């Protein structure tokens, strides 16, 4: 019986190393698989982070483009309104010129007449409204400035030096600092 028991023990002891080897090999294989899975997981995570960065950068660019377009549209809208006001102002200039001419003519006939006074009040109110909207007359003082004045003739003048404004023939106007129409003037030329 001891022999039988020894044989079984020998048989089991021979099987044990094989089982241990198989178990160790299995554990090694599992460890390698875990490392592979961990490596794949890291690779997937890196890919995800790269894609996230790309998408985030695209989002930031699109958002910046959107903000730029929004600002450009606001600026274009503002410029369109500005242009519309400028066009209206240009259309009003002949009316203003006609009122100025009527006032001058009425003042030549009778400075104290009701018509002259009415035209004066009308011109004052018109200039107030125009100034409120950024339209103002160009100053025509002594100095000629080609940015604001258009010299359409030169005249001899004993009172004025060369290049000085002698007479304003047509009033000039500015809209928010930009010249709508330069003032038509005559300048002194004394040779």
UniProtKB/Swiss-Prot annotation:
Record key words, sorted: Chaperone, Cytoplasm, Stress response
Main localization (coarse): cytoplasm
SUPFAM superfamilies: Coiled-coil domain of nucleotide exchange factor GrpE (SSF58014), Head domain of nucleotide exchange factor GrpE (SSF51064)
Family statement: Belongs to the GrpE family.
Protein name: Protein GrpE
UniProt key word Chaperone: yes
Top-level lineage group: Bacteria
Keyword Cytoplasm part of the UniProt annotation: yes
Subcellular localization: Cytoplasm
Summary of the function given for this chain in its UniProt record: Participates actively in the response to hyperosmotic and heat shock by preventing the aggregation of stress-denatured proteins, in association with DnaK and GrpE. It is the nucleotide exchange factor for DnaK and may function as a thermosensor. Unfolded proteins bind initially to DnaJ; upon interaction with the DnaJ-bound protein, DnaK hydrolyzes its bound ATP, resulting in the formation of a stable complex. GrpE releases ADP from DnaK; ATP binding to DnaK triggers the release of the substrate protein, thus completing the reaction cycle.
Assembly information from the UniProt record: Homodimer.
Any matching Pfam family: GrpE
Organism name: Helicobacter pylori (strain Shi470)
Gene Ontology biological process terms, A to Z: protein folding
GO CC terms in record: cytosol
UniProt-annotated stretches for the region Disordered: 1-22
Record-level Gene Ontology MF annotations: adenyl-nucleotide exchange factor activity; protein homodimerization activity; protein-folding chaperone binding; unfolded protein binding
